[in-house]
């Protein structure tokens, strides 16, 4: 690796895009997303094997999001001048280690340790993903490079849950994570081969990132982001027990539902730019309102498989607008501090994922099967009301 560590120290002066490096980063992103969501489709066998409830098993998603939240806030201060190439390799190693620890976990504690390793990689990577991509291509090619990265995210979201469900039935949930560890090893070798030296900056200006929250409408926006993602994770983390017990889906049927959800999400992401051109605020208020209605429909009529499948498709199609919409809100309303605002956004989303999965799991175990749906629908409705009343939007 020394030959490429020594070269191109002036990354900012890059004149030709390094597409191999961009695709290696995109592959790493896809692997992180896939492994993050594997427990969603493997929750029941994981819980049975470890002798815990499905609600407790769902906390494997919670701990990943919780650790990722802190990693996203503090990673840039921690790594400072460290070459970003080494940092990305470390994230790929943590991804691989996480999969192996989960695969060999004989207790809930070891499972959580493995998922915490994933949280470090996930939060740290997302905090620096945009700046990393921008250093691999010339300025004119940045949008195309970012589209490759986020395209990998969309593809990973499409295949993660149905692939986990299908392979889990075929080879067992532990071997699914062993297969994911192999993907992690491929990440390591591809990054070593393709990623150039990307020297870190010794220090950043000591500006208070959280002072951004004092700007008009920003705090309301972050609260809305929190509620929308908490609502998503309160429902999606427990989609397997809800759909298998409420609608009576078997493993094969659930796999098809999850695949439909993923395809709908991919289509929603593809259409999001067209919708957001019309009105970002309308999309940010309208999407959670549709999701709130969908949660109500599933609660009342979810025992019908056709209704349950339709709700999954509508949910995937609609929620796809949410992350793209809030990123657009940041680039328009906080363009002068987009990097700092993005860091706060990542932390808020991870905190929301933590709280949504945790409270949803508690509700599932202690209140009832449809309680995660009711929690999700309530949060989505509150999000729609808050966006309508308080969130400010600058025109592009």
Swiss-Prot record:
From the Swiss-Prot or TrEMBL record, what is one GO molecular function term? antiporter activity
Q: How does it sit in the membrane?
A: Multi-pass membrane protein
| Pfam families for the chain | MFS_1
Gene Ontology CC entries for this record: plasma membrane
Provide the catalytic activity annotation. inosine(in) + H(+)(out) = inosine(out) + H(+)(in); guanosine(in) + H(+)(out) = guanosine(out) + H(+)(in)
User: Membrane-spanning regions, if any?
Assistant: 22-42, 55-75, 86-106, 108-128, 148-168, 176-196, 216-236, 256-276, 282-302, 306-326, 344-364, 367-387
For this UniProt record, give its keywords in alphabetical order, as a comma-separated list: Antiport, Cell inner membrane, Cell membrane, Membrane, Transmembrane, Transmembrane helix, Transport
Q: What NCBIfam families does the entry give?
A: PRK10213.1 (NF007578)
What function is annotated for this protein?
A: Involved in the efflux of purine ribonucleosides, such as inosine and guanosine.
Q: What's the protein called, per UniProt? A: Purine ribonucleoside efflux pump NepI
Question: Which species?
Answer: Shigella boydii serotype 4 (strain Sb227)
Q: What is the lineage of its organism?
A: Bacteria, Pseudomonadati, Pseudomonadota, Gammaproteobacteria, Enterobacterales
